[in-house]
A protein has these predicted regions:
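Conserved, mostly hydrophobic/aromatic
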Residues: 29, 124, 152, 199, ...
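Short, well-ordered coil/turn segments that N-cap beta-strands
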Residues: 4-8, 33-35, 115-121, 155-158, ...
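Active-site acidic/histidine proton-transfer and metal-coordination neighborhood
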Residues: 115-116, 126-230
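Intrinsically disordered, Lys/Arg-rich low-complexity segments
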Residues: 350-464
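Gly/Pro-rich active-site loop or hairpin
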Residues: 14-16, 173, 210-213, 229, ...
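Conserved beta-strand positions in the central sheet of alpha/beta enzyme cores
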Residues: 38, 161, 229, 268, ...
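N-terminal pre-domain/capping segments
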Residues: 1-125, 131, 136-142, 146, ...
């Protein structure tokens, strides 16, 4: 099976990233071993101003610290991507502040960093999109898709992900036709502006929002440049928790392949809490009832070209968790294939050492008795050579020498064992004689009478 790329990444700047800019986020994604990132284009702030005198004669890409998304000349929009477009006096500039970058140079630099680090970029349009609402809300939603496309062009992003909105009072068939018409206009505008990013339609997780998998496939089939975004937690919640086995995920992929011929797929994954066919909230993968292991088993078998974005509250942590699970399943499959090859087609290797021939059997199928070990040779004592004994006259043979007997070891006498010595008791300390201390009598005390020592009697002199 040919090798393909399965990419993992977070939906936004990683939580563990110390910096909060898109540059920091992309570098942190690469450091974590991930290779995809979905930039959140969720804040759209538009400002209008007249062109300054020093800007007359310049183009939209030459404006510093501002991103010009539209030029109104006589209250009519002018394409901002025309190479010969120059500002004139009285023009009104529409500038965008989105939190991703300040101007075109910032977007281009971010895209170059991602390309150097092999991090695939995508862009998520504002979450509140309602193509089936009132005319004002629908126009604002399509404008947000256009602005997202302009940013994606400078970033080099490959996908603009969007929701589609509520059904409202529209029947499902009528809602389908309206969505197709509006998305067709946006896609044609993308083509005129030479925006290569595809528009990804995300599956919805609630019954009141347009976006079942069948509706998305119908829209993508009728409008070119649109692809479905396989949001597995949304599909799992909308259908009542059906994605539990590897075969369940296989059915989803087979349905997409039958309808569309797509080389690369795009998806979201996380845990989800749901009730009555409606999504309640996203959860970490381990806390939801939809496990990643069945999807990993399918991916390891089919090896499709797909990007999986973590929508979990843990973002990059669950993205790394999914990558580890997939690698484990792949290693397990490789080990299984190698074992089967050994059983079926691998030749038996010869033994390293030759096998000894079997021993010959004796009579009646019994093995021969082992030979008795001979006596060890007697070493001759160093010194003079022993005299040769004369041979007998009768036979002419020398008499056999008797083998010298080894002296028998003396028998051990029954020596009574000595009793263990009794432990010595510690001797009493001898009193230490101290000289009498010469102390002065205290006043008022009685003097102590000293004992008289009798002197020894002198010897009497001898008489002469």
């Amino acid at each position: 099976m040919p090798e393909s790329m399965i990419r993992f990444g977070p939906g936004g700047i990683p939580l563990s990233c110390k910096g909060r800019t898109q540059r920091d986020g992309i570098e942190d994604v690469h450091t974590l071993g991930l290779n995809a990132m979905e930039i959140q284009f969720v804040r759209v702030n538009l400002f209008e101003r007249y062109v300054a005198d020093e800007e007359i004669g310049q183009g939209p890409l030459q404006v510093a610290n501002e991103f010009v998304v539209d030029v109104l000349r006589g209250r009519k929009p002018v394409s901002v991507f025309e190479p010969e477009l120059k500002f004139e006096k009285g023009d009104i500039l529409k500038t965008l502040n989105c939190g991703i970058g300040r101007d075109c140079s910032d977007f281009t630099e971010i895209g170059e960093i991602a390309a150097d680090l092999d991090v695939s970029l995508s862009l998520h349009a504002p979450y509140y999109m309602d193509l089936l609402g009132t005319e004002e809300i629908a126009v604002r939603s399509t404008d947000n898709l256009r602005y997202a496309g302009l940013v994606a062009r400078h970033l080099g992003a490959q996908m603009v992900v969007t929701h589609l909105g509520f059904y409202h009072e529209n029947p499902k068939e009528q809602a389908l036709e309206k969505v197709i018409q509006k998305l067709k206009e946006v896609r044609e505008w993308y083509d005129r502006m030479k925006i290569g990013a595809r528009i990804g339609l995300e599956a919805s997780g609630k019954q009141v929002i347009f976006g079942s998998i069948d509706e998305l496939l119908t829209v993508c089939k009728r409008v070119g440049g649109l692809v479905p975004v396989l949001s597995f937690p949304h599909m799992h919640a909308r259908d009542g928790g059906v994605l539990k086995r590897k075969e369940d995920f296989r059915e989803v992929f087979d349905k997409v392949r039958e309808c569309l011929k797509l080389g690369t797929l795009y998806s979201h994954f996380s845990g989800v809490e749901h009730e009555g066919g409606n999504e309640l909230r996203f959860t970490p993968i381990k806390k939801g009832d939809m496990r990643f292991e069945p999807l990993a088993e399918f991916l390891a078998d089919e090896n499709p070209e797909i990007t999986i974005i973590s929508d979990s509250p843990l973002l990059e942590h669950d993205a790394m968790y999914m990558k580890v699970i997939l690698e484990r399943v792949q290693l397990k499959n490789e080990a299984k294939v190698s074992r089967e090859e050994v059983k079926v087609g691998a030749p038996i290797k010869p033994p390293l050492k030759p096998i000894a021939p079997p021993k010959k059997k004796g009579k009646a199928g019994t093995l021969p008795a082992p030979k008795k070990a001979g006596k060890p040779p007697v070493k001759k004592a160093a010194g003079r050579a022993l005299p040769k004994t004369p041979a007998k006259a009768s036979g002419g043979k020398a008499p056999k020498k008797a083998a010298p007997r080894k002296p028998a070891a003396p028998k051990a006498k029954n020596i009574p064992k000595k009793a263990a010595p009794k432990p010595k008791l510690p001797s009493k300390p001898k009193p230490v004689s101290r000289p009498p201390s010469k102390q002065k009598p205290s006043p008022g005390s009685r003097p102590v009478a000293k004992k008289k020592v009798q002197a020894a009697p002198k010897p009497k002199p001898k008489k002469k």
